[in-house]
């Protein structure tokens, strides 16, 4: 099966629908699937639930989907870099489900592994725990967290071979590998596509069995904040 598509719009063809749930990799703006996010914006899809560590910035990353009010709900860990998000949330126009960062990562990993839920001490005694099942183990209280899956996972990797085996690069790996396993359909944008067999099997981070569609993208790789000083 050919997994390679000519561009981001083609790779999302037939996948986007109103009310869908997406996962979008990245940590801040590092390792985000910027081409696929732009293509999803251009579909006009509405009422999206977006699972992502961050909400992008005002005019980049998932911030593009917030500008056009295509996102209905965010399941995230940190959203403080986006003024558009703040305004919509405080006006009651956007739903938010906060997760501690480690809990968010484990919920995604669990979803990808077919694990419906797990117990954690993180959040016990805080607002995070409200409405969640509590259970004691060995004299300590834990809360139940559920696994997460998405209709479509949007992933950024460094390289892919033609079978969809992926290699990530440094910090840009972040949430991408676990999200690649947790999408009903996983679409990946990469900086380079190579021939199958080019990778040392020990260097592959995500096996191609998890990957459905691949594009070779062009990347701005914007930096959120840059601090400089005089030499």
Cite the ranges covered by each PLM segment:
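Conserved alpha/beta enzyme-core scaffold
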Residues: 1-231
């Amino acid at each position: 099966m050919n997994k390679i598509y000519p561009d981001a719009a083609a790779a999302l063809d037939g996948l986007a629908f109103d009310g869908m749930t997406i996962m979008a990799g990245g940590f801040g703006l590092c390792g985000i699937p910027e081409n696929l996010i732009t293509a999803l914006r251009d579909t006009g899809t509405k009422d999206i639930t977006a699972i992502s560590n961050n909400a992008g910035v005002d005019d980049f990353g998932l911030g593009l989907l917030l500008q056009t009010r295509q996102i209905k709900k965010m399941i995230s860990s940190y959203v403080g870099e986006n003024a558009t998000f703040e305004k919509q949330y405080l006006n009651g126009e956007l739903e938010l489900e906060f997760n501690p960062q480690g809990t968010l990562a484990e919920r995604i990993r669990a979803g990808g592994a077919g694990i419906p839920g797990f117990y954690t001490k993180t959040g016990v005694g805080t607002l995070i725990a409200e409405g969640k099942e509590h259970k004691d183990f060995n004299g300590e209280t834990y809360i139940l967290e559920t696994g997460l899956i998405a209709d479509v996972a949007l992933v950024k990797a460094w390289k892919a071979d033609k079978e969809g085996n992926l290699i990530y690069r440094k910090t840009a790996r972040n949430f991408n590998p676990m999200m690649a396993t947790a999408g009903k359909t996983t679409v990946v944008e990469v900086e380079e596509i190579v021939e199958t067999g080019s990778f040392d099997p020990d260097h592959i981070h995500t096996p191609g069995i998890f990957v459905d569609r691949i594009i070779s993208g062009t990347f701005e790789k914007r930096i959120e904040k840059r601090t400089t000083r005089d030499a």
